Amino acid sequence: GPLINTVTRGARLKKFYLRSAATGVGKTRAMIADACSIACDEIFDLKQNRWVKNGTKEPTIFISTEQEKDEIQTMMIAFLSGVDEEHLLTGMYEQQEWDRVVYAAQLLKNSPLYVQQLPDFSMQDIENTIKRGIRDYDVKYVFFDYIHTSMKILTEVTSKTGIKGLREDNVLFMISIRLKDLCNQYQVFILTATQLNADYITAQQYDQNLLRGAKAIADKIDAGMIMLEASQDDLKALDTLIKQNGFEKPAIKMSVYKNR
């Protein structure tokens, strides 16, 4: 959105961003929203109750390691159309929602937004997928959902290093190094995510120490953010600002701990 664009100067080519969150906060949905915002030139504005122009259509690839393609497609259409995802899943639409869904589906079809599944991936798989997107579709924006270990990547790392039982933090750090290298090598923007460790529940400061598996991942990123549910203390602190400006109460807060 415009606020984060102001902080980071947008999705810059040759830059590697990391946005982490606890389970269930919405890492995938936030990433899908960003991918659609870059690749699609229209979006339904609920406040204006009409479709509005959304800039240019930039070639974008969304790489999923957990979600199925149909799940991702549903989330994309829900975001573009402004229709509750539950309505798409149940087929029970309110007035004019079906027309918006049909229009959003056509918009998505005509946009340079490509989805690739990598359920059990290696570093070579990630690299090949990005390179294929660049070669076949001139992709400039890459969304990788999300950094974690897999059996295939553990086997690959063991084979390359000759070291058995390599710690998870080392493997995750190696993935982040390769992703940053790909940013520079192919002049693309990459956004990825990680889970948070349990310390986020009691933390007073939200930074790389909350990243699950390896805080060293943050060494290679150009922007680091943590998404959390807004607490009652947060809402209390914002109460005056919300009332004075007529803002809606936020459900999510974002802490930016690195920005270069």
Label every PLM stretch briefly.
Residues 24, 51, 174-260:
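Phosphate-binding/switch region of NTP-binding enzymes
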Residues 18, 140-143, 191, 225:
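Structural motif
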Residues 112-185:
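Phosphate-binding/switch loop-helix module in NTP-utilizing enzymes
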